[in-house]
Amino acid sequence: MARLRIPSNFIGTLGSDTLVGEELNASPAIGIDILIGGYVLTLSGKDTLTGISTGNDGGSGTGIANRGKLNTGNGSDAIAAIGDGGNGSKGGNGGSGTGIANSGQLNTGNGSDAIGAIGDGGKGSDIGNGGKGGNGGNGTGIANNGELNTGEGNDAIAGSGDGGNGGYGGDTNSDKYIPLLGKGGNGGTGIGIANNGELDTGGGNDAIAGTGNGGTAPKGGFEGYGGAGIGIQNVKGATITTWTGKDTITGNGNSSRANSTTYGIFNDGVIDTGKGSDKVIGQAIATDAYNNDGLVYGIYGQGIIKTDDGNDQIIATGILDGVQQQVSIGGGINIDLGTGDDYFKGFGVASVDGGYGFDTLDLTAFNRSQLLVSGVISGNTLNCATFTFNSNGNPISFSITGFEKFIFADSSFSYSTLANRA
């Protein structure tokens, strides 16, 4: 099956339309390619679009590339895409793999729609006789640089990105017999959802999930670095908006080997979940890190997260070689939980406002005695309080306002009792 290239433009029927594009062993390989000025309009109905691609010899693979307009109309529509980067040829790096690359307008209309995309980076080549292995390619599930709108309805967006593994440098058994022979290639970066535009799910009980798995660096010789894993990345100036409904945003980042860097949600833009009882969950896991040199943050960045009205939950966790980290947030991010009985779990360099309602702060990663508390004034929960943790001589401060209950590993306090013991 060949690449489906638009134009020629496509207008569907009022029934259930199906479009499939597949391109294998090409460089670059693109399953469905909508060019600037091109459009796909499938009108109403339960429509299905599928794009599959595999690059060759280190070439890139993109399941669906949209630089024009893709509109599936009203109805419960499904868009699926797989983009595999090609493995590196001798001496080369693996190619990048992207499930959906949108720099135009992608609109699924009203209805309970589903978008799923997988991007796998290619493996770096193996080099013998003391050479350097190729680096793994980057993998991105959904890369949105334009407008992505799923309209009204209970919509689901899922992106999974796997970085390619680095190639061996020298003999594959060099870690056993010749420890300093060759240098392994680095693993590629894996990002589930990378948003540099507008991602809007409209009203409804929506779910956005991103999983990013960094590629590994092979052992043997001088070991390369493991690739970063980022579940959801929302850059400066970009927005993720889920509007009214019980929405869930989940970012899972995974990485392994030396210099592991992992983020569940990396937000430098704005994430707004709108009204409703919403959940935002960021989890970062690093394994087999050299001398525990991994960097893991459940939620990180310099942006803003707003959950508006409703009984909302935000949870940030980081796990390094099986050990839950006490510091799971970073970058100085600002979080506003709005009105409602909210729950927040996590600690790090951030400012968190519980807003109005009976809000709970979960600090069960710490005993009460491990944190220095300042700024607490009895009867005034709106006064900014600061929790400070001494991390190997490095003080880490966490600023909060508007919380009424505080849970530690060994105790729990109301605001007034915490103030009395601050």
Predicted regions and their residues:
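Acidic, glycine-rich low-complexity repeat segments characteristic
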Residues: 1, 95, 137, 186-197, ...
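Glycine-centered beta-turn/loop sites at beta-strand termini
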Residues: 12, 21, 42, 72, ...
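Collagen triple-helix signature
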Residues: 58-61, 78, 85-97, 114, ...
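Extracellular beta-strand repeat scaffolds in secreted/surface proteins
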Residues: 49-51, 77-81, 115-117, 157-159, ...
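N-terminal segments that cap or nucleate solenoid repeat domains
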Residues: 1-62, 67-68, 72-77, 242
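Structural detector of coil-to-beta-strand junctions
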Residues: 29-33, 39, 61-63, 78, ...
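Thr-biased low-complexity repeat/linker tracts and other Thr-enriched repetitive architectures
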Residues: 60, 69-89, 93-120, 138-155, ...
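Conserved consensus positions within extracellular tandem repeat modules
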Residues: 15, 24, 43-45, 73-75, ...
